[in-house]
């Protein structure tokens, strides 16, 4: 099971993510309190080992902007949280994580997606998509056809991650606010989160 730590905005935090042996690191390019510039993402990316995959998070971004950022930051994966069309997705040259809300409609759309990974997140709060620290009923994900490529997100933290994994058994988990203290990434929480994910007693 892999772990993605999202919303990285500094070299120090990126190093904490690397030290904790996360599998993926997420840069948010969409409007958000965790949004960072392409220049800063490029600077951080240049410090990372090849063992960690760099994920760029976008919401209905013009395709040419994504293609430019992929090249500048050397992204490994693109994560899409908007209403991007199938044709749009086909023009992205690297693997895609397609995010869907944990709703009946969202799950129906997820089942039709050909993206490499399906990320299921809590339904958006007002205009915010992702990173809101709110959980949802994980039981709705049991026995979904896309479980083998499912990334679970939405309100995960060091306290609930073991129960989440036992319930859903996803391919990966994605956390942002759940490893923060006072709105800032907390190295100890990052390490504890990953330790809890890796504990053998969480697996079915």
UniProtKB/Swiss-Prot annotation:
Pfam families: PRAI (PF00697). Its EC number is 5.3.1.24. This is N-(5'-phosphoribosyl)anthranilate isomerase. One of its GO terms (biological process) is L-tryptophan biosynthetic process. The gene is trpF. It is an enzyme of class 5 (isomerase). The keyword Manganese does not apply. It catalyses: N-(5-phospho-beta-D-ribosyl)anthranilate = 1-(2-carboxyphenylamino)-1-deoxy-D-ribulose 5-phosphate. Belongs to the TrpF family. Pathway: Amino-acid biosynthesis; L-tryptophan biosynthesis; L-tryptophan from chorismate: step 3/5. It comes from the Bacteria. Keywords: Amino-acid biosynthesis, Aromatic amino acid biosynthesis, Isomerase, Tryptophan biosynthesis. InterPro entries: Aldolase_TIM, PRAI_dom, RibuloseP-bd_barrel, TrpF_fam. It comes from Oceanobacillus iheyensis (strain DSM 14371 / CIP 107618 / JCM 11309 / KCTC 3954 / HTE831). GO terms for molecular function: phosphoribosylanthranilate isomerase activity.
